[in-house]
């Protein structure tokens, strides 16, 4: 087995906390594409749905650029979940006080490789 070419996809400012998406990303790192999608579809998390969209986008980028490529030849190489923008707002509380509310977002970067078999 040798690795021929890499294809990437990015999801920016996705509405989920990076802390919630990272454990899901760890489950699919290094897995074949079909297995990674099966894992993500079986998870009930919002982050799994967002991650699935980015993984599918990376795979479709790979199949668009290489017409001879099938889903069986693709595997997930790199999955990075970084902090995105934080939306801060005020949450009114009792007796005239206010708390700060921080809505977090994340950036997801997925890199897939094509797996080819050949003689050595």
From Swiss-Prot:
Molecular function per GO: rRNA binding; structural constituent of ribosome
GO cellular component terms, A-Z: cytosolic large ribosomal subunit
UniProt-annotated stretches for the region Disordered: 1-25
Metal-binding in keyword set: no
PROSITE patterns in the cross-refs: RIBOSOMAL_L22 (PS00464)
Gene3D superfamilies in UniProt: Ribosomal protein L22/L17
UniProt record, GO biological process: translation
Record Pfam families: Ribosomal_L22
Keywords: Ribonucleoprotein, Ribosomal protein, RNA-binding, rRNA-binding
Role according to the record: This protein binds specifically to 23S rRNA; its binding is stimulated by other ribosomal proteins, e.g. L4, L17, and L20. It is important during the early stages of 50S assembly. It makes multiple contacts with different domains of the 23S rRNA in the assembled 50S subunit and ribosome. The globular domain of the protein is located near the polypeptide exit tunnel on the outside of the subunit, while an extended beta-hairpin is found that lines the wall of the exit tunnel in the center of the 70S ribosome.
PANTHER family per record: CHLOROPLAST 50S RIBOSOMAL PROTEIN L22-RELATED, LARGE RIBOSOMAL SUBUNIT PROTEIN UL22M
Oligomer status and interactors: Part of the 50S ribosomal subunit.
Protein family membership: Belongs to the universal ribosomal protein uL22 family.
This protein's name: Large ribosomal subunit protein uL22
Organism of this sequence: Borrelia recurrentis (strain A1)
Gene that encodes it: rplV
């Amino acid at each position: 087995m040798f690795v021929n070419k890499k294809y990437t996809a990015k999801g920016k400012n996705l509405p989920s906390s990076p802390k919630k998406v990272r454990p899901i990303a760890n489950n699919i790192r290094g897995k074949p594409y079909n297995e990674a999608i099966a894992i993500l579809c079986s998870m009930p998390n919002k982050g799994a749905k967002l991650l699935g969209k980015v993984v599918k986008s990376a795979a479709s980028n790979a199949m668009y650029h290489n017409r001879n490529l099938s889903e069986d030849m693709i595997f997930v190489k790199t999955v990075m979940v970084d902090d995105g923008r934080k939306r801060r707002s005020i949450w009114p509380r009792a007796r005239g006080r206010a708390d700060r509310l921080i809505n977090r977002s994340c950036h997801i970067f997925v890199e897939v490789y094509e797996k080819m078999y050949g003689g050595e």
